[in-house]
């Protein structure tokens, strides 16, 4: 509704273009414009801080980020990977976006002089080994190879690459990891034990091989229809990954919406009303925590 008959809401506001497209880690990594408008809210910051602390203080190197569709997990994955990217300009921009200057543990966990080799994979209901191998070859500038690769040889190559002096380390991003798990549960993909092998190898790689899987639901839920013994096996695999919930608080969502909406004209009372609403939401959140 507007103050002038005949005018539409679209005459006043529109959605910023960079908020109208979904992020795809394999296509958007390496692009400066993929970070345009990104907001690193407290939830995202806490995830990075948690990971940095785990990598610094323990031998944990594999993580899952679990949260609802459209929650910003892929965007954070691109920003995080960009902060480790060999491209210095991209790396600097991503670090500023993520405000890593105020996160001292990050540089301890992910030392970055030459850049990390980032291996972005988008999940599908097929072989994770095949897709990860293809992504690794592409990241290293190699051509496609249709020959099958064994789990052990793929993991060995990841570890050897992580030790290569050309890079500071290897970061594997498994976006839509749940699709690989679904394939495993339906016996259309690889044995879920591969994820355990990968995690165990990463734990022995002196912090130079880090794996992040992006999920929409808990690891166990993907295997909920399996038999009891098989579910127990899945639980053992899940135990190798530290799960970090990715659920933005309501005030963070409001801020994101506020950034996404572009208003050409604003009524004089708008700022005061917006501030009152934001304060009310923050107050409600504090009470719910208490």
Identify the meaning behind each predicted range.
Residues 81-116, 143-153, 223:
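Flexible phosphate/Mg2+-sensing switch loops adjacent to catalytic phosphate-binding sites
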Residues 1-71, 78, 83, 229-244, ...:
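Walker A/P-loop-proximal flanking segment of P-loop NTPase domains
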